[in-house]
């Protein structure tokens, strides 16, 4: 996997409204709405860019056409730009495009699809082809897996300017089929159905150290023991749509508790920050002395970060503690370094919400 500056950061610098940018449109992500030779776990290296979001490479077609995608546990569809995208779709011009004429395994579908984001609707039509992870296996990522007959979206219109600056071409959703647009079987569910891995498991290692090599990894079919000590802790999925679990509470030092009495939370690799209800996050920022900026961001004086309280999430009776360095982000611009809070307030309405979203700030710890 590779890390890149989030759309939110890139577009925020261009004064775009944050509601259009964070998590590729979480309002719509959360508001509404299963024979080849088996093999061992398949690693996919992810790249870390400026401690923000993560992408990896896949191939679509025969021979494979390579695309960079966000492996997103907060959505369930795979889409990439199409060679047939609209003339005025600038985002399409600057990214790799799928060309069905160059694939011997392409099967026409043609059903139209729409995925709604805060800045507009991404639209196109469905197609079917093989999907390879990674695109071209190498010595650093041996093996690989090819999923046959995978339905995916060819995007012919991408909304607003959000995707223009993106360092990824598309998105590969890894949530449950229940939230898949057009009821398309997600890639990993198709992979399981075709019995391409011994264990129906995938795992992420996200390293927030941008200098670390290899930086991050997605493992299909298992876990990589070199990235953890001891035994794994399991939490029940409370609703098979997103990777949704129950959070008992969230403590800010000894001065504040939010999510009192418990709440629901989503573990989402496609969101950079931790997102919670507006009123609760406002209280959290008050407790850590963060100062509001424009566009929903909060700043913390960098010299005060080390003295901030720890933030502890209690999940299934187990404490997961974030240090101040874990939940703050250093951003340098025009020679000046500022420290931003890793928390964002956003109210997610029923039936999907209210929810906390545990993004890369949490997962990367």
Curated annotation (Swiss-Prot):
Residues 1-39 form a propeptide. Pfam families: Asp. Changing residue 268 to N: In CONCL; inactive. GO terms for molecular function: aspartic-type endopeptidase activity. It comes from the Eukaryota. Glycans are attached at residues 109, 236. It is linked to Defects in CTSD are a cause of congenital ovine neuronal ceroid lipofuscinosis (CONCL). CONCL is an autosomal recessive disorder. Newborn lambs are weak, trembling, and unable to rise and support their bodies. However, they are able to vocalize, support their heads, and to suckle if bottle-fed. At autopsy, the brains of affected lambs are strikingly small. The deep layers of the cerebral cortex show pronounced neuronal loss, reactive astrocytosis, and infiltration of macrophages. There is severe degeneration of hippocampal pyramidal neurons. This is Cathepsin D. It comes from Ovis aries (Sheep). The lineage of its organism: Eukaryota, Metazoa, Chordata, Craniata, Vertebrata. The gene is CTSD.
